[in-house]
Amino acid sequence: MKNAYYIGLMSGTSMDGVDAVLVDFSGPQPQLICSHTEAIPSHLLKGLQRLCLPGADEINRLGRLDRNVGQLFALAVNNLLAKCNIAKEDIIAIGSHGQTVRHMPNLEVGFTLQIGDPNTIATETGIDVIADFRRKDIALGGQGAPLVPAFHQQTFAEIGKKRIILNIGGIANVTYLPGTSEHVLGFDTGPGNTLIDAWIQHVKSEPFDKNGEWAASGKTNPDLLAQLLSHPYFSLAYPKSTGRELFNQAWLEQQLSPFNHLDEEDIQSTLLDMTCHSIARDVIKLSPEGELFVCGGGAFNTQLMQRLAALLPGYKLDTTSALGVDPKWAEGIAFAWLAMRNHLGLPANLPAVTGASREAVLGGRFSAK
């Protein structure tokens, strides 16, 4: 059978690098052929973080960063192809998520904005790019997120098996696969790594808390935990999605101001528990028992996985490796899959998940010619 090669590009709310994956969709399950992470240069990272919050001269900064991020994504593709020793002519299309700089679906006229100019990516790689996946769903009255549940359904669902796929990036999202003819459900539970990363970056200038070791050295403060979990987002009904617009460094500092007597590691432990408790609450609402498979950066945080398991005794906990998909690359593979769906003219959103009025083909194609 002829190979069906697509490339997926993903940079999430953690902004910890651009993940590039080469995936073959010619078989019954996606096959990861090769992967690469392109580091985000510090000057670009600072520019993106600044753009995620309201500020002056935004349009000029947005335009420049749109091109800069496109160039970085193109570099990630070219380095991936060199690593895999695959010719660009063998790739059907690139699926690029871009970099989210605003996600505001609940305004009177909701919107979401990802940058990383697909014209630049197509021109600098010589490969057609499919991008702008979220805005069709928003135009149909949906949240534009999460989009990965449709991929999870096709890849991980099994009749008779009640499964939850938990993706823990900067924001955490769940996909409920009932194992029956019931609707698949999915939504963002709230912060994943974004606040625990922000705190260790602020205090220790380290990019992330490896294995949750710093959190493990602290003791959770129940009063701070209760305050953090009182955020209105956690009591919203789904469909719902969120991002840095709600959960960011400024919000965290505001929450911490009455607790400045706490040790820094105790705050880290409490932030980790906020992530775990908010996830566990939503998982239990979906089903008190079943199988839970974790992907994303959080799958590699030992302390997070241990605390989550303790909060979910009715669940068998594992990573998506057990289902044949490397948890580090799962979201990149999903965006390669979204590109394939667009190329074939097939819908890729789940209205029961996003709240859109109907299924739709997502994304637009940007030719390399």
Swiss-Prot record:
Family the UniProt entry places it in: Belongs to the anhydro-N-acetylmuramic acid kinase family.
Cited Pfam families: AnmK
Q: Which residues form a coiled coil?
A: none
What pathway does the UniProt record associate with this protein?
Answer: Amino-sugar metabolism; 1,6-anhydro-N-acetylmuramate degradation; Cell wall biogenesis; peptidoglycan recycling
| Role description | Catalyzes the specific phosphorylation of 1,6-anhydro-N-acetylmuramic acid (anhMurNAc) with the simultaneous cleavage of the 1,6-anhydro ring, generating MurNAc-6-P. Is required for the utilization of anhMurNAc either imported from the medium or derived from its own cell wall murein, and thus plays a role in cell wall recycling.
- Enzymatic reactions: 1,6-anhydro-N-acetyl-beta-muramate + ATP + H2O = N-acetyl-D-muramate 6-phosphate + ADP + H(+)
Q: Which InterPro entries match?
A: Anhydro_N_Ac-Mur_kinase, ATPase_NBD
GO terms assigned for molecular function? ATP binding; kinase activity; phosphotransferase activity, alcohol group as acceptor
- According to its UniProt record, the EC number is 2.7.1.170
Per UniProt, where does ATP bind?
Answer: 12-19
Q: Cross-referenced HAMAP family, in alphabetical order?
A: AnhMurNAc_kinase
The biological process GO terms on file are: 1,6-anhydro-N-acetyl-beta-muramic acid catabolic process; amino sugar metabolic process; peptidoglycan turnover
Q: What class of enzyme is it?
A: transferase
Question: Which gene produces this protein?
Answer: anmK
Put simply, this protein is called: Anhydro-N-acetylmuramic acid kinase
Keywords, ordered alphabetically? ATP-binding, Carbohydrate metabolism, Kinase, Nucleotide-binding, Transferase
